[in-house]
UniProtKB/Swiss-Prot annotation:
HAMAP family: IlvD (MF_00012). The gene is ilvD. It is an enzyme of class 4 (lyase). Its cofactor is [2Fe-2S] cluster; Mg(2+). Pathway: Amino-acid biosynthesis; L-isoleucine biosynthesis; L-isoleucine from 2-oxobutanoate: step 3/4; Amino-acid biosynthesis; L-valine biosynthesis; L-valine from pyruvate: step 3/4. This is Dihydroxy-acid dehydratase.
Length: 557
């Protein structure tokens, strides 16, 4: 066993002595040592319950004849961090999480790992670590939150609360109505109830094969989560015995299938960023062109909030992720069904018994929302290396209008609230990319303000930053190269006409090449917003969004 490095041989007497101080007995040194990578954090509702959850995981590991050791990672709640400097720490926290898991697991020579993530950057951070460490691993997330209901019986979620702020600001609802939405938008523990980033990544984790069937959709408060825990411990033991590791599971074909589900469900645009980062950790050459190819061949079968009023509980009731995959498998060339997963079985075997139980929630191949996926990659003179739009969350497929330019999210939000944005405008928020932000903050507050003011279909928004999975409307993010790297978005001027064509996958500014070249020569890189601490280091090392915004090793030659 891998853990023999710290427990076998006369020279490991000091190690065993220390381990006995934690409660181990001599007989435990013949069993696999399992890292329980938890993320219990009281300020994050998606993680509030994970303390008790972790205890259940440890019990299941012991029952399977292995020895559990629990530790916790940090985490950032994107909703609470939204709209202030806290959001700059969100994406960078993914790297800290990956590094911290790598540190604990490699320092102590564990034989296997069970990861307990749930919310936005915590799931991909742990997934990156699992691929980097590459020991047998199973993921069991904390599960989605249920949707809420206002006193009037209206179904609401966190997206409703953010949009309620814009609606109140524009006089569409009263303060009492906003308070009602606030009180009921997040009714329980769990990851926010729509197809936002957390749930998108937990669903993708299931498709990739790192998590068990049901992981993406079974609610946090559902007793079936406990059954998943028991299965996870049993399956991990099999993975250890068969020496099946994350890099055996997460192949290019597995990533294709993850994006196929993403397209079928119209997941968060953040999935593109995180899954590209996973590919980097797995040593795979996977780019946005391949994502676009997946988008072109996968129909959009399922709309979940913010694209509709359906939530993860409805997906679960309708058959879960397995039912969506089973339907997709009917179309040739969409899924790779014979690859191995964390169950020890193939994807084909995992979904064999699945079926759609509600065709209003999960559409059939014969009745898709659209013939192509719910996410699309746009390119053009404004995004040479690509940009992303959640096409399934807007009915507008072509938009052209003059730019209203803001050089930060704070500046943009103030401008929107002051009425500086009108019907037909293209709002540009730049210098908010991985390097420029720094940290590539999410733009949920501006998009929600626009939607709440009733302009969601009449105003477009472009940014080199990110969008929350709760964002909707004509929102194009991840524009690469970013402004801080001298990308074309930095060269835009007030009033420039920008064209967004979702069907043709184009993002262009109606300015001549000669004029753009002239502006580029005159452009000067602004001073970094942050020069010290973790964010200062991050800004110097982070790569572009089109490569996953991962950290690069500085070249000292």
């Amino acid at each position: 066993m891998r853990s023999d490095m710290i427990k076998k041989g006369f020279d490991k007497a000091p190690h065993r002595s220390l381990l006995k101080a934690t409660g181990l007995k001599d007989e435990d040194f013949d069993k696999p040592f399992i890292a329980i990578c938890n993320s219990f954090i009281e300020i994050i509702p998606g993680h509030k319950h994970l303390n008790e959850f972790g205890k259940l995981v440890k019990e299941a590991v012991r029952a399977a004849g292995m020895v559990p050791f629990e530790f916790n990672t940090i985490g950032v709640d994107d909703g609470i961090a939204m709209g202030h400097i806290g959001m700059r720490y969100s994406l960078p926290s993914r790297e800290i999480i990956a590094d911290s898991v790598e540190t604990v697991v490699n320092a102590h020579w564990f034989d296997g790992m069970i990861c307990i993530p749930n919310c936005d950057k915590i799931t991909p951070g742990m997934m990156m670590a699992a691929l980097r460490i590459n020991i047998p691993t199973v993921f069991v997330s904390g599960g989605p939150m249920a949707a809420g209901k206002t006193s009037k019986g209206e179904v609401v979620d966190l997206s409703s609360v953010f949009e309620g702020v814009g609606a109140y600001q524009s006089g569409k609802i009263s303060e009492e109505e906003l308070k009602d939405i606030e009180d009921h938008g997040c009714p329980s523990c769990g990851s926010c109830s729509g197809m936002f980033t957390a749930n998108s990544m937990n669903c993708l984790c299931e498709v990739l094969g790192l998590a068990l069937p049901g992981n993406g959709s079974i609610l946090a408060i559902d007793p079936r989560r406990e059954e998943l825990i028991k299965q996870a411990a049993e399956k991990l033991k099999i993975l250890i015995e068969r020496d099946i590791k994350p890099r055996d599971i997460v192949t290019e074909e597995a990533i294709d299938d993850a994006f196929a589900l993403d397209m079928a469900m119209g997941g968060s645009t953040n999935t593109v960023l995180h899954t590209l980062a996973l590919a980097q950790e797995a040593g795979l050459d996977y780019d946005m062109n391949r994502i676009d190819a997946v988008s072109r061949r996968v129909p959009h079968l399922c709309k979940v909030s913010p694209a509709s009023n359906w939530h993860m509980e409805d997906i679960d009731r309708a058959g879960g992720i397995s039912a969506i995959l089973k339907e997709m498998s009917r179309k040739e060339g969409v899924l790779h069904l014979d690859r191995i997963t964390a169950t020890g079985q193939t994807l084909r075997e995992n979904i064999a018994e699945a079926e759609i139980k509600d065709k209003e929630v999960i559409h059939s191949l014969e009745n898709p929302h659209s013939e192509e996926g719910g996410l699309r990659i746009l390119k053009g003179n404004l995004a040479k290396d690509g940009a992303v739009i959640k096409s399934g969350a807007t009915e507008v497929k072509r938009f052209e209008g003059p730019c209203v330019i803001f050089n930060s999210q704070d500046e943009a939000l103030a401008g929107i609230m002051l009425g500086k944005v009108k019907k037909g405008d293209v709002v540009v928020i730049r210098y908010e990319g991985p390097r420029g932000g720094p940290g590539m903050p999410e733009m949920l507050a501006p998009t929600s303000a626009i939607a709440g003011m009733g302009l969601g279909a009449e105003v477009a928004l472009l940014t080199d930053g990110r969008f929350s999975g709760a964002s909707r409307g004509i929102s194009v993010g991840h524009i690469s190269p970013e402004a801080a790297a001298g990308g074309m978005i930095a060269l835009l001027e007030q009033g420039d006409i920008v064209c967004i064509d979702v069907e043709e996958r184009l993002l262009e500014v109606r300015v001549s090449d000669e004029e753009l070249e002239k502006r580029k020569k005159e452009w000067k890189r602004p001073e970094p917003k942050v020069k010290t601490g973790w964010l200062g280091r991050y800004a110097q090392m982070v790569t572009s969004a089109n490569t996953g915004a991962v950290l690069k090793i500085p070249n000292f030659d």
